[in-house]
Amino acid sequence: MIRFRNVAFSLVATLTLAAACSAADGSMLKTPPGAKVAVEVFEDLECPDCARWYPVLFEVANAHKVPVVLHDFPLPMHPWSLDAAVYARFFDTKSQKLGEDFRGYIYKNQPSINKGNLQQWIQKFADENKVPLPFAVDPEGKLKALIMADRDLGSRAGLQHTPTIFVVGHGGPPSPYTEINEVQDMEQNKAMLGQAIEDMEKKVGSVAAPKPTKTRTHKKKAS
């Protein structure tokens, strides 16, 4: 019980600090159709903290039965993150699960990947999943344009780091949101995220969810 109380006290303090220090504005984000609450994350496939968070996002979101919406935010100082994001989008076109699995695969092997060997890792994943890679995965730049649109959205929201994680509620505009500011302890991060989802569900409980349509959301846990 003492340990639980300490964690609870620390959680409240962290949430308060996060609310006070948050610089990003998630009010322009929207939940996907059919969802009252969603976890929305701006990620960079070369970011170590994104790798730590990736499985946690799906674990907590699945437990609360809310979708995860992934936004690409490749940082300029990372030499291969944009290329990896293009391939992630390519695998998304094959199936949502394949796109999720590719991201999980990249995050898992991130310490061994560099600009010079990225293509080898991509080819290995494609071979293991029996997906033939075309000579050019994005010949017209359409996948890159989607990535740049996500990055522009993040820039307008005032993002300063990855991952930037929001719990967003249906409503508005502006949409109700909470930014999750991570701490070193991932168990505490899980608790923070779960609490933010529960709080948002209470906040928007009486609001009707938007009608379902096809959208790019990610609900299953990545491998």
Residue spans of the language-model regions?
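A short beta-strand-turn-helix
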Residues: 23-37
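Extracellular/periplasmic catalytic domains that process cell-envelope and extracellular macromolecules
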Residues: 32-34, 61-63, 80, 156-161
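Short pre-active-site segment immediately N-terminal to redox-active cysteine/selenocysteine motifs
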Residues: 38, 43-46, 161
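C-terminal cap of thioredoxin/glutaredoxin-like
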Residues: 123-223
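Alpha/beta-hydrolase fold active-site loops
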Residues: 37-38, 65
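Bacterial N-terminal signal peptides
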Residues: 8-19
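N-terminal secretory signal peptides that target proteins for export/translocation
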Residues: 1-4
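Structural alpha/beta surface segment adjacent to cysteine/selenocysteine redox centers
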Residues: 45, 51-127
